[in-house]
């Protein structure tokens, strides 16, 4: 996903919100999706491969695909319990 170079800083927030909704919409259609920095860490190569001009900032990459039952895709790393990193105050 890109935004024009002259965009205001708030445009990045809007793009992030849009990308989150796109990921949710993909899930609703049965697609797996994830925002991935690895897809945009080389913006010059992304521009060349995708035909994106220098007037756009390469900001967000989203990987899309259909879920699989392969053992590699089933890998799930150990995670910290959410209560150790999140506090919700009423």
Predicted regions and their residues:
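Short, hinge-like loop/turn segments at secondary-structure boundaries
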Residues: 51-54
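C-terminal helix-cap and adjacent tail motif
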Residues: 58-90
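Active-site-flanking beta-strand signature of metal-NTP-handling nucleotidyl enzymes
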Residues: 1-2, 62
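Helix-biased detector of long, well-ordered alpha-helical tracts
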Residues: 2-7, 86-90
